[in-house]
Amino acid sequence: MSGDTGPSKQGGTRYGSISSPPSPGPQQAPPGGTYLGEKIPIPDTESGAFSLRKLWAFTGPGFLMSIAFLDPGNIESDLQAGAVAGFKLLWVLLWATVLGLLCQRLAARLGVVTGKDLGEVCHLYYPKVPRILLWLTIELAIVGSDMQEVIGTAIAFSLLSAGRIPLWGGVLITVVDTFFFLFLDNYGLRKLEAFFGFLITIMALTFGYEYVVAQPAQGALLQGLFLPSCRGCGQPELLQAVGIIGAIIMPHNIYLHSSLVKSREVDRSRRADIREANMYFLIEATIALSVSFLINLFVMAVFGQAFYKQTNQAAFNICAKSSLHDYAPIFPRNNLTVAVDIYQGGVILGCLFGPAALYIWAVGLLAAGQSSTMTGTYAGQFVMEGFLKLRWSRFARVLLTRSCAILPTVLLAVFRDLRDLSGLNDLLNVLQSLLLPFAVLPILTFTSMPALMQEFANGLVSKVITSSIMVLVCAVNLYFVISYVPSLPHPAYFSLVALLAAAYLGLTTYLVWTCLITQGATFLAHNSHQRFLYGLPEEDQEKGRTSG
């Protein structure tokens, strides 16, 4: 199966052992094949030469993917890391973004080479029980991400209305605005991608404005960015580092990106076209994640400058002397270090730099919440279709996800206070980190299979780097669990944690086992797991084509 052309049952070699037959026309995708049922044609240019026209044609999926790097959970993680550690964790943000890019590169390659997304490949290769458990974990990650978007949007509405819209009211508004944004589907793929680009621009301008007015110390900022150290750090700083990793590298985003790249018309019978598509998607993802990194850097630097080592009393005094003195009581009058969240963050910016800073912060937060809503909807639909072969309309899919997200959020908003809502945001960031192995292990497994990826399978360097990412994430998660268990409020919780830990370790062990098979540990392959070495049997391929 090497070379540009060759005989096969379909008249031409198709890369990826589970590839589907060619689509009937250059503009028409198979039903459900892309997120808008259409494909973007790629212009013909001089072979081997870089083309801005081609880069523009491939631009879109990477920026949609980058939205997950900018959701309200990321904003909360950024500002808390700045408030807790100053500039000391900027290097964690930088390298988490680089590691995220490496994972997204693998996701894009899988989609381009095989013509199927990660959920579809999992459906074909994993047995039923692990497959269902894996699907449930990714759905949990999607609901958790959606809860963060609901929280961020509700707080943005509260800030923009000067408190006239209560938090529970903001939560309910998110139901309406979500369905409004679904109407964007009717305006075509490129217009939808342009709208997401507009929201990213809003975030860059609003959070960039906060960076300019805060004027962080540039020397200390550069030192924190490029010197990986954390002098004097303890458990609070470590938990913030875990939160950064969980917020930046989100499990469902890997599944999302592997499906988004299918929206471009790539001739998978030609290895040159596949190689070219991989290159352009990598360039686009690098540009998109560079923008997202700068936006996250703006937020962390602003709060590292304005909030680091601030006490509640100091924050109270700052607001009491400002034009926003009515907000001062949200800060307790004590000398404890202030525990900032996305609501208090907007308030203190307004107290320090004027009301405009507060409203600009709220607009950026609103853009983060709204953009993440749409990408979360697409991720949920792709995951459900891929794992279960169950096709729902986006309306039904968003109704399910948003209902699961809103119920606990609105209960907290009604019966508890803002601090509990922000605390939930922090917990959800850690949840994303805990669930990350259920995306990284499958993508590493399948992109390392020569039977599936052929000449585009991971090389030794890629395997080592991605495996190192996985070991790092698992080590950090293990440390978090060991640190968290002693703080459980009641002994009865220990049995629940033990049950969840057993299920978690069982599924992780299975995924590691199959991953090791593809990395060269052939002695681990038995019976049906031979497919991880040699691809699917011919009859399984045919079933995959008819059901996929």
UniProtKB/Swiss-Prot annotation:
GO terms for cellular component: late endosome membrane; lysosomal membrane; phagocytic vesicle membrane; plasma membrane. Its main location: membrane. One of its GO terms (biological process) is iron ion transport. It is found in: Late endosome membrane; Lysosome membrane. Residues 1-55, 103-139, 185-193, 257-284, 367-397, 448-463, 514-548 are cytoplasmic. Residues 74-82, 161-164, 215-237, 305-346, 416-426, 486-493 are extracellular. It holds the Pfam family Nramp. InterPro entries: NRAMP_fam. It catalyses: Zn(2+)(in) + H(+)(out) = Zn(2+)(out) + H(+)(in); Fe(2+)(in) + H(+)(out) = Fe(2+)(out) + H(+)(in); Mn(2+)(in) + H(+)(out) = Mn(2+)(out) + H(+)(in). Keywords: Endosome, Glycoprotein, Ion transport, Iron, Iron transport, Lysosome, Membrane, Transmembrane, Transmembrane helix, Transport. Coiled coil: none annotated. Residues 1-38 are annotated as: Disordered. The keyword Glycosyltransferase does not apply. It is a multi-pass membrane protein. Belongs to the NRAMP family. Macrophage-specific antiporter that fluxes metal ions in either direction against a proton gradient. Localized to late endosomal lysosomal membranes, delivers bivalent cations from the cytosol into these acidic compartments where they may directly affect antimicrobial activity. Involved in iron metabolism and host natural resistance to infection with intracellular parasites. This is Natural resistance-associated macrophage protein 1. The gene is SLC11A1.
